[in-house]
């Protein structure tokens, strides 16, 4: 075994670690040296979003010690950044060890003299963002790995606006965390009196905030019997979504029993991700059985929402995040216009890999559409930047996330579920489904279709392979894709844009990010982006055609599918 790895292992075996941890290390030495090497070959990186990794012993795993060291670094930065009393909010999801990690986090903060508002039990991530603003905290942490498989856990760090860390704070916190060289530098206990348990009072304030997002409460009264099927996929959504739907006025809500109990083993699914058809399978079956109007599913920390509706043939389909975002954007913008409350400085915000239909729709409604890097922290940063100058209405991205209004600063599946049900009620009152409304928007703004493929590369070699793929695209970018010339080559890492046809160059006015985009003459857009939280590289595809009428939908839909397949083949990604 590599000497540096062995040294780290010896440090844990001989250091101030509990006996169970040492026993687990010795067991791995005997039974799985390869797994042991992976657990210690690097330090689990405190990235710009915090920690995310497999649970277990070692420097490259989520455990008490890596969580404690991260919290000590973050605590040091908070105390250096704010004079006077510093306070934080701490929450967690339904994953195995999430409560333990949240309590560890709270204890370390308190031992550093920081006041802690700790949720008494599991709660949705968006409520953590809300709590930071509600209590006027300087920061916050939620222990969650969002939609990752059950073996994972994570630690997301937030700033005083309720958003995840952005520059300069993200890099500065990373530096402080990296300074913590040993678990002996962590203040583990003392200051327990600074921890205050929170729950029902914050829940009520949050629910009132969500109720205020309703656009047409009278429509809900007319359509209160809308048949809704909801699955929390063994996660935190169960703590708030049923209450919120009831408060909105919906009376016919069926919760999928098999997935209603919070359980970190996610026994009915492999990936607790509402983007996955298999994950939504039980919910789809229940929706069919009940002849429901709408199916909704939230991931374990209830920041992503999946939606099922009947298509133009009456068959149940799952909408993707782009379709959901477009429908929500349009609903809110049209409602503001029809109610006479639209403002000349209204804006929506989306991300660089989200459908181009967002821009077309914004233009059609006379509002600005800003594009930021992937992740809601960048949407939140843009809101902060434009505060007092422009009016934020809604933001969303392709990864099944929506953020409605500016009272919280992270994606929120709880408010999204409520709004999507209201949208379904609104369309039902007009005698159509959400899918039929989507087709109407395609006719108006163009038929945009997107797809995503993820290539997984695990372990030490995987990172190198992903880096090599990105370097290959950078050094030898395609001149044309599927027969259409590339007219924009966007390198967000270098913040450079280039038109290979004319030689024109420009600067991209966004922070650096390891993303490459190729836009072709026929309007196709291909984006390559290594995941920040999983051992994957993601390729996003967006294509477009005109749609003259609803009767042409199936033909054009099939043609767009063929176009995406041809692009994937042309890029050698089959």
Model-inferred region functions:
Residues 40-60, 145-146, 232-244, 300, ...:
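Conserved phosphate/anionic-ligand binding catalytic regions in large, soluble enzymes, centered on
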Residues 288, 292-294, 315-317, 335-529, ...:
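Phosphate-binding and adjacent anionic-ligand microenvironments
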Residues 89-152, 247, 251-306:
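N-terminal small/polar loop signature for handling phosphorylated ligands or for N-terminal nucleophile
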Residues 101-109, 152-159, 303-321, 358:
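Short Gly/Thr/Asp-enriched flexible loops that form oxyanion-binding sites at enzyme active sites
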């Amino acid at each position: 075994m590599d000497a540096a790895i062995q040294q780290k292992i010896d440090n844990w075996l001989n250091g101030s670690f509990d006996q169970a941890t040492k026993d687990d290390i010795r067991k791995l030495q005997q039974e799985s040296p390869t797994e042991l090497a992976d657990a210690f070959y690097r330090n689990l990186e405190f990235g710009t979003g915090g920690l995310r990794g497999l649970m277990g012993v070692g420097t490259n795993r989520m455990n008490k010690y890596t969580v404690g060291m991260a919290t000590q670094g973050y605590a040091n930065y908070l105390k250096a950044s704010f004079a006077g009393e510093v306070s934080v909010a701490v929450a967690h999801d339904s994953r195995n060890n999430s409560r333990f990690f949240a309590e560890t986090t709270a204890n370390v903060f308190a031992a550093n003299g920081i006041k802690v508002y700790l949720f008494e039990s599991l709660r949705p991530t968006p409520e953590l963002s809300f709590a930071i603003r509600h209590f006027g905290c300087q920061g916050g942490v939620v222990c969650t790995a969002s939609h990752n498989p059950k073996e994972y856990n994570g630690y997301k760090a937030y700033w005083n606006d309720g958003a995840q860390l952005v520059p300069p704070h993200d890099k500065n916190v990373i530096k402080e965390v990296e300074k913590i060289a040993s678990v002996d530098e962590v203040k583990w206990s003392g200051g327990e009196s600074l921890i205050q348990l929170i729950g029902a009072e914050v829940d009520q304030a949050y629910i009132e905030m969500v109720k205020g997002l309703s656009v047409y409460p009278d429509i809900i009264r007319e359509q209160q019997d809308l048949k809704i099927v909801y699955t929390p996929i063994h996660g935190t959504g169960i703590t708030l979504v049923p209450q919120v739907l009831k408060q909105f006025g919906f009376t016919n809500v069926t919760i999928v029993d098999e997935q209603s109990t919070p359980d970190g083993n996610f026994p009915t699914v492999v990936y607790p991700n509402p983007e996955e058809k298999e994950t939504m399978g039980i919910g789809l079956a229940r929706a069919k059985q009940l002849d429901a109007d709408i199916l909704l599913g939230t991931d374990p920390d209830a920041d992503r929402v999946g939606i099922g509706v009947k298509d133009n043939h009456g068959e149940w389909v799952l909408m993707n995040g782009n379709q959901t975002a477009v429908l929500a954007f349009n609903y809110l913008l049209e409602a503001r216009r029809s109610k006479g409350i639209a403002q000349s400085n209204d804006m929506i915000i989306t991300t660089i890999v989200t459908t181009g239909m967002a821009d077309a729709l914004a233009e059609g409604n006379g509002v600005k559409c800003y594009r930021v890097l992937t992740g809601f922290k960048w949407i939140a940063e843009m809101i902060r930047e434009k505060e007092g100058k422009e009016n934020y209405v809604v933001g969303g991205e392709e990864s099944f996330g929506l953020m409605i209004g500016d009272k919280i600063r992270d994606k929120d599946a709880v408010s999204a579920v409520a709004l999507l049900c209201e949208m379904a009620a609104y369309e039902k009152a007009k005698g159509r489904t959400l899918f039929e409304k989507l087709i109407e928007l395609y006719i108006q703004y163009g038929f945009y279709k997107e797809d995503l493929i993820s290539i997984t590369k695990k372990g030490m070699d995987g990172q190198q392979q992903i880096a090599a793929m990105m370097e290959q695209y950078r050094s030898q970018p395609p001149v044309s894709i599927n027969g259409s010339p590339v007219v924009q080559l966007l390198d967000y890492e270098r913040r450079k844009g280039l038109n290979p046809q004319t030689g024109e160059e420009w600067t991209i006015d966004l922070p650096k990010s390891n993303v490459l985009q190729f836009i072709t003459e026929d309007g196709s857009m291909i984006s390559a982006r290594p995941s920040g939280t999983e051992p994957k590289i993601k390729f996003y595809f967006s294509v477009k055609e005109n749609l003259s009428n609803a009767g042409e939908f199936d033909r054009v839909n099939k043609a767009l599918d063929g176009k995406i397949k041809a692009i994937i083949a042309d890029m050698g990604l089959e």
